[in-house]
């Protein structure tokens, strides 16, 4: 079985706006992207997660985005199926760091107890070694953005 070990992570970029004027509930949209690039020897990989949250009225009242990169060492990768397993493991290990950054931003801006919903990454749905479909092509290769529902 292939295993990923988080070696280090860093916040690459953060954007935040809070122009809420009154207390109460607000409807939010959330989207994320996640991809993993493997070294040719299969012993290392870099995972990249981007998450954004904004108000459903266009993001002018509330917007937060965090871009986090993690470096992993990998054991037992022998093929594409192993890479799919590691892909899911990298997300599971990197998500809590990204979640903490967004929680701290929200807490500091007067929105306590904010929680993002963690996606379930099914290894069977992971594409290995293929570019995204034309309609999913990111504006910038280093920061793709795809919506989730």
Which residues fall in each region the model found?
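N-terminal intrinsically disordered, cationic/polar leader segments
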Residues: 1-93, 100-103, 107-149
């Amino acid at each position: 079985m292939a295993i990923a070990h988080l070696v280090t992570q860093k916040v690459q970029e953060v954007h935040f706006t809070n122009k809420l004027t009154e207390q109460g509930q607000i409807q939010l949209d959330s989207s994320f992207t996640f991809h993993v690039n493997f070294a040719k020897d299969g012993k290392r990989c870099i995972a990249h997660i981007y998450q954004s949250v904004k108000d459903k009225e266009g993001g002018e009242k509330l917007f937060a985005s965090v871009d986090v990169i993690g470096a992993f060492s990998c054991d037992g990768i022998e093929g594409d199926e192993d890479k799919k397993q590691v892909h899911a493991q990298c997300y599971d290990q990197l998500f809590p760091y990204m979640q903490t950054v967004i929680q701290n931003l929200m807490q500091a801006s007067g929105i306590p107890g904010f929680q993002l919903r963690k996606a379930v990454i099914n290894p069977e749905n992971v594409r290995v070694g293929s570019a995204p479909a034309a309609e999913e092509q990111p504006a910038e290769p280093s920061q793709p953005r795809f919506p989730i529902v």
